[in-house]
Amino acid sequence: MASVVLIGTQWGDEGKGKVTDFLAEKADLVVRYQGGNNAGHTVVAKGEEFKLHLIPSGILYEDKTCVIGNGVVVDPKVLLEELAYLSERKVKTGKLLISSNAHVIMPYHRLLDALEEDSRGEHKIGTTKRGIGPAYMDKTLRIGIRIMDLIDDEEFAAKLRRNLQEKNNLLTKVYGVEPLDYDAIYQEYSGYAQKIRGLVADSSLVIDESLKAGEKVLFEGAQGTLLDLDHGTYPYVTSSHPIAGGACTGAGVGPTRINRVVGVIKAYTTRVGEGPFPTELADETGELMRQNGHEFGTTTGRARRCGWFDAMIARYAVRVSGISDFALMKLDVLSGFEKIKICVGYRVNNEVIYEFPQSQKIFKACEPVYEVIEGWQEDITGVTHFEDLPKAAQDYVRRIEQLTETQVTLIAVGPGREQTIVRGEIF
């Protein structure tokens, strides 16, 4: 038995898709355990770029079983569009399974998401308006529609009718918009049910049997540590649990079955949407990072905010997820900078703190305390061994290891599978 949880350690967009794709080669089962189509993964395989939002990145390996776990909220329309996209790209998807316990994103979830975000005015939290939050709200309220309900005509009809009455009251009386039509939604979603029925499974059982058989299981997280509902920069967070603990509840597996936790972390920092960002660079340096790193969201196309590496965030991610290894991404983007800065603390109210603050009020007031190190000018996109990196790049990696007390096991020097420096085995 070997199982690895792969998580994002910053605000998402760290490059998890590439690392999942890289590790999936040795895995037998790849499991997505939280989030929805608000997440985006970009994977480059055999020179081709694939953009995925819901289906695990391991789908690009035909012999791997991929599972959408119970912790995921599924928009069936998006799922079928993604399956069609992969089919057009000649990718076989016959080994995809969907948890019967996963919750379904409904049209009223998407509509309410947009209306609620727009009503916040200057207090927007940066939602993607894809219905993720409202779907998780219904899950918590115990009125959600699960995949198992969707494929049961009687259950689906009853739950949809009950929910739609409540949602239409909200839409008409609070937001002043037209109500949604029951028959139209029922017909549309019944059609989806027929198409996905053969993919539905008891995913927890599938994972359990795989582990008992000694197979290798990779749990793929979406978003990142600082977007976690409990441990992120609340309220600028997602509605699920991207940290390692989320894999247990979102996939139906006990914590003693997890062997390693790999934290995916960029060699610099990015953030999409609202909220504090101490190392943000609103200047030419930040713009250079954005252009060199192609920092535009896979899901939204929004330009990502860019800044220097923040060791405070990295240490915090290690603490809340028990990270055993880092996968350091986009080291090549830093080539050409004469000096590189690392945030090693925060200055707030004339005091320097060295732990990530819980209060957003304090976090917003934080100014970065930087350590400046030498940069490198060489193109490193073709380097395959750590010892062949420029000394300054090696020193940068080692300094991150020192500051986080965590080994950097994988280093990405480009988007391709082959552009990965391996310093130790994960599986």
From Swiss-Prot:
Its main location: cytoplasm. GO terms for cellular component: cytoplasm. Its cofactor is Mg(2+). It is found in: Cytoplasm. The active site is at D13, H41. Binds 1 Mg(2+) ion per subunit. One of its GO terms (molecular function) is GTP binding. IMP binds at D13, E14, G15, K16, N38, A39, G40, H41, T128, R142, Q223, T238, R302. Mg(2+) binds at D13, G40. Plays an important role in the de novo pathway of purine nucleotide biosynthesis. Catalyzes the first committed step in the biosynthesis of AMP from IMP. Belongs to the adenylosuccinate synthetase family. This is Adenylosuccinate synthetase. The gene is purA.
